[in-house]
Amino acid sequence: MAFCSPHTTTSLRSPCTTIPNSGFRQNQVIFFTTRSSRRSNTRHGARTFQVSCAVEQPIVIGLAADSGCGKSTFMRRLTSVFGGAAEPPKGGNPDSNTLISDTTTVICLDDYHSLDRTGRKEKGVTALDPKANDFDLMYEQVKAIKEGKAIEKPIYNHVTGLLDPAELIQPPKIFVIEGLHPMYDERVRELLDFSIYLDISNEVKFAWKIQRDMAERGHSLESIKASIEARKPDFDAFIDPQKQYADAVIEVLPTQLIPDDNEGKVLRVKLIMKEGIKFFNPVYLFDEGSTINWIPCGRKLTCSYPGIKFSYGPDTYFGQEVSVLEMDGQFDRLDELIYVESHLSNLSTKFYGEVTQQMLKHADFPGSNNGTGLFQTIVGLKIRDLYEQIIAERAGVPAEAAKV
């Protein structure tokens, strides 16, 4: 486990340095106590906090969802919040499922399949079945990463359906495990600093799969229905129950603005946020704890049919107190999102309009005109804030000093 010792300094050339020490890396991270520039702090002798860590202990984030439910898009939004593009390991297996950015490493839990595609077919199990996955290895390796140790992680090749040779994964600042089972095994679940579940309703999932598999892959409607029905028992048994453990759930439902809509193009999206989670304060609309319905369409927000409706209020979810923010409808102009952003609180933004900026930056991503993109972006900002508060606590410095 990482050992961090804070001490004070009046000046330093670099805000973060790496110093060789007895065969391991020693990181020094500097936290300034005021928002003024580093130069003015030094000039006036203001104290800064310098934190020396023998090994940086990553925070671990879990993201659970069924296949084809937007995990990859969410990861692209999340890594963008922290800066730097997420790319496969350089010089590694071209079919690797891992993505690495400046601060974040994302691994796909499909890599812990214990059976290849042929093996699953022979045994009559799906990839959703725990019997087709190695949870002991998953736990051991996630635990090792959290302790700051490198691992040799297996690779499941989605192209060939085979188990490829392992790849070396170094501990990052933020380690994200995404896939079918991040919260299934209690041992793995307890390693998570924060967890998210993407809950796509059956109606929307079916509409999305038809759009993707018929239009892009040439599958018949009958084969799509058969595929969904074949997976449903295992999904209901092993994947869906994980949402009760998630700290935040993004639930995607059919719109209520269009009667009997079954196309899945206009969506109603809920951000369900647990109360009482350390370092996580739920986002709220207008007045925290109140029950509010808001139709923002008008002079400051362009809305074509069927319009936009926001709702917010307290609720219970699997017996736990939650706050729920809901958006039904879609944006016509993303630049006008700033009007909505200005009425939301606890966003954990660095500056006014950061949510809107992130949404405009990735306007071509799926869901950018509705609540899926908006709430994924907000959760990404909340995870950044959570990371900063965790490292501040570990270093023994004020939380404000860790803001970057």
Swiss-Prot record:
Q: Which positions form the organelle transit peptide?
A: 1-53
Where in or outside the cell it occurs: the entry states:
Plastid, Chloroplast
Q: How is its activity regulated?
A: Light regulated via thioredoxin by reversible oxidation/reduction of sulfhydryl/disulfide groups.
**May I ask which residue range the UniProt record assigns to the signal sequence?**
none
Q: Please name the GO terms of the biological process aspect recorded for this protein, alphabetically.
A: reductive pentose-phosphate cycle
Keywords in alphabetical order, please: ATP-binding, Calvin cycle, Chloroplast, Disulfide bond, Kinase, Nucleotide-binding, Photosynthesis, Plastid, Transferase, Transit peptide
User: Keyword Plastid, does the record have it?
Assistant: yes
Determine if RNA-binding is one of this entry's keywords: no
Q: Which GO terms describe its cellular component?
A: chloroplast; cytoplasm
The pathway it acts in is: Carbohydrate biosynthesis; Calvin cycle
One MF term from GO for this chain?
A: phosphoribulokinase activity
Similarity-based family:
Belongs to the phosphoribulokinase family.
According to UniProt, the name of this protein is Phosphoribulokinase, chloroplastic
Recorded source organism is: Triticum aestivum (Wheat)
